[in-house]
């Protein structure tokens, strides 16, 4: 039976630009994926339900074997399923707490292969006027969907180098996105200044 997969994924192998401007495959290639898996809505029935989609999605990850994955829109039940079905990956997500509601925490997760990476640091910020505190995007007409970026700093056990990976969830309204891109870039530059030798990946 064919399943309709309600997610959008981009998988790429990173390349390095060597001194003469030639693009070459890195000595230790890094395969990264960004994927909006769509939340498990009760309105999604049959082949569009998460129960029908989750195994094909996991199979795709197993087939492509990305080293790092940025995910948007997973909910609690989906987190639990992916943790159970993908035990070879470690993960970072923002959990609700006394200061951050479930809605404000949005929904995002970064996964990385346990055997290849160690997580040295992690963080998050909202794509809005107060990035350190829960906020909606600038001039948002949608008052329900918070948008944010989460990130991890990983140590690559193969190359010995550090890698920053950012997973960004942009708003629906295209008019809000330029400000979000600008905010994303500024925050990333501030974080990246901590080290000049790290690779930096934004999804």
Regions found by a protein language model. Give the residues of each.
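His/acidic metal-ligating clusters that form di-metal
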Residues: 146-168, 179-203
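Structured beta-strand-rich core segments of catalytic domains in phosphoester-bond hydrolases
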Residues: 72-172
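Bacterial N-terminal signal peptides
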Residues: 7-19
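Acidic/histidine-rich helix-loop elements
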Residues: 34-55, 99-100, 128-144, 171-193
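N-terminal, active-site-proximal structural segment of metallo-dependent hydrolase catalytic domains
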Residues: 15, 22-85, 99-105, 198-199
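Positively charged n-region of N-terminal signal peptides that target proteins for export
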Residues: 1-4
